[in-house]
């Protein structure tokens, strides 16, 4: 059947993505209330009972707000590295011991024919990760909350059929915005979030003929807009000599208030 996915919600207020392959259905993060996650799942004809587990990227509230409630309600295993478990355990409430699963950074785990592999990213959290999903020859990468894209991250995200990649802010909108300077400095720093320009620069370096789509994710509601993000990302790519036709590669939207359509990774 191959990999398909939907980004249920993406942004500074909450992040939830679902990846499935016919045998297994996994959720990445649970950054909204359990009630809201259930509503978004229903929009894609799913319920919590369809889920086989939750993969955690890091401990910030916009990624774990509903984590404990979802795990308890549906008896779901939670997969996270040891340091992330240490950062989330007190805040998410009681979790059954059999649902506390350690997946260390760089390790992989097979769920039937789908392999999940985590890799380290740069963010101001205990031990943040992003995830690659493999099934046969298919590869999906989900990577947000990056201060910058290191050479190791470029290697990890390259050659994906589809990417979900952070494009958090427009630098000038952030600089002129209402946040205090220490918050702006954190967002702009190497442990912060990826700007539109940085996302475009990264794509220009890793894009191959195999990669058909990139979903721009984790957009700031205060310091970005989807049309601006797509224009800036494409401009940054073209500035670096990376030109493409829409028939070859597309930049796709994500939303904070509704899910993206199901997307089959293998579609042309």
Where are the regions a protein language model picked out?
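Conserved beta-strand hairpin/beta-sheet module of binuclear metal-dependent hydrolase folds
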Residues: 1-44, 127-145, 162
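Structured catalytic core of nucleotide-sugar glycosyltransferases
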Residues: 6-16, 58-63, 89, 116-118
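Active-site metal-binding motif and surrounding structural segment of the metallo-beta-lactamase
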Residues: 35-81
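Active-site environment of divalent metal-dependent phosphoester hydrolases
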Residues: 60-64, 85-87, 126, 148-151, ...
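Metallo-beta-lactamase
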Residues: 82-130, 134-137
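Metal-dependent catalytic neighborhoods of phosphoester/phosphodiester hydrolases
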Residues: 65-74, 89-91, 224-231
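Active-site neighborhood of phospho(di)ester-bond hydrolases with catalytic His/Asp-centered motifs
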Residues: 28-31, 51-59, 79-82, 141-144, ...
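Cap/insert and terminal regions of metallo-dependent hydrolase folds
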Residues: 151-252
